[in-house]
UniProtKB/Swiss-Prot annotation:
Protein name: U1 small nuclear ribonucleoprotein C
Organism field: Emericella nidulans (strain FGSC A4 / ATCC 38163 / CBS 112.46 / NRRL 194 / M139) (Aspergillus nidulans)
Taxon lineage: Eukaryota, Fungi, Dikarya, Ascomycota, Pezizomycotina
Chain intervals annotated as zinc finger (Matrin-type): 4-36
Compositionally skewed regions (Pro residues) per UniProt: 80-181, 227-236
Its biological purpose: Component of the spliceosomal U1 snRNP, which is essential for recognition of the pre-mRNA 5' splice-site and the subsequent assembly of the spliceosome. U1-C is directly involved in initial 5' splice-site recognition for both constitutive and regulated alternative splicing. The interaction with the 5' splice-site seems to precede base-pairing between the pre-mRNA and the U1 snRNA. Stimulates commitment or early (E) complex formation by stabilizing the base pairing of the 5' end of the U1 snRNA and the 5' splice-site region.
Entry similarity comment: Belongs to the U1 small nuclear ribonucleoprotein C family.
Length: 236
């Protein structure tokens, strides 16, 4: 029958039974030998354990460099988003032809982008002369007037002149009134009488009864010039 050997006490037990082993392990001598054994192992291997821990920390420090030891001019390693996956190793590609735009991370708010600018001309399918966003031309207004200032004219029309006066359409009847204060012109619809030595308008006479002419005002002579009023005339 094999015997049980106690490594702490360095002795063989008389019987290899559970009752004998329990009685030996609870003895005073066995407990003292166990404490001394572990104390001896700790004193001998304390320095080796310290060296192994130091070397393991040094190996981890080489894999992940200290941010304080980064040389000047170098970029620090990118950090991941909080509570999400780490960023790609080559960074986020910029949007455009070189790389597609990446969607925002989950849980992040949408960035406020500026709204698109409205088109300068009317949309496709709008009638000619329509304003921006397909507004119709107001009634009784020339087509050129519907175009707002600063925008391109509709197809088939000329841009307005720089002075600001629109060009009348081909079927526009009548002309523009003369500029006020122009020399040699009177009010609209008034034809001045010819001066002395000048012939009257074609088809009209100089007298009051001439067809197509105008009668001179009271007190005006036949030559077109009137004398002084009776109260201011010279005494003869």
């Amino acid at each position: 029958m094999p015997k049980f050997f106690c490594d702490y006490c360095d002795v063989y037990l008389t019987h290899d039974s559970m009752s004998v082993r329990k009685a030996h392990n609870s003895g005073r001598n066995h407990l003292r030998n166990v404490v001394e054994y572990y104390q001896q192992i700790g004193q001998e291997k304390a320095q080796s354990v310290i060296d192994s821990i130091t070397s393991s920390y040094a190996a981890e420090g080489q894999a992940v460099p200290n941010p304080a030891m980064v040389p000047p001019g170098a970029y620090p390693p990118p950090f991941g988003f909080p509570g999400q996956f780490p960023p790609p190793p080559f960074g986020i590609p910029p949007p455009g032809p070189g790389g597609a735009a990446m969607p925002p991370p989950p849980g992040a708010r949408n960035l406020p982008f500026p709204p698109p600018f409205p088109p300068s001309s009317g949309p496709m399918g709008a009638p000619p002369g329509a304003g921006p966003a397909g507004l119709p031309t107001p009634p009784n207004m020339p087509p050129n007037m519907a175009t707002p200032p600063g925008s391109a004219p509709p197809p088939g029309q000329f841009p307005p002149p720089p002075g600001g006066f629109p060009i009348p359409p081909p079927n526009f009847q009548g002309g523009f009134p003369p500029m006020p204060g122009a020399p040699g012109q009177g009010p609209a619809g008034f034809s001045p009488s010819p001066g002395p030595g000048l012939s009257g308008p074609p088809g009209g006479g100089s007298g009051p009864d001439a067809p197509g002419g105008f009668a001179p005002p009271p007190g005006m002579g036949p030559g077109g010039f009137s004398g002084p009023p009776p109260a201011l005339g010279d005494k003869r």
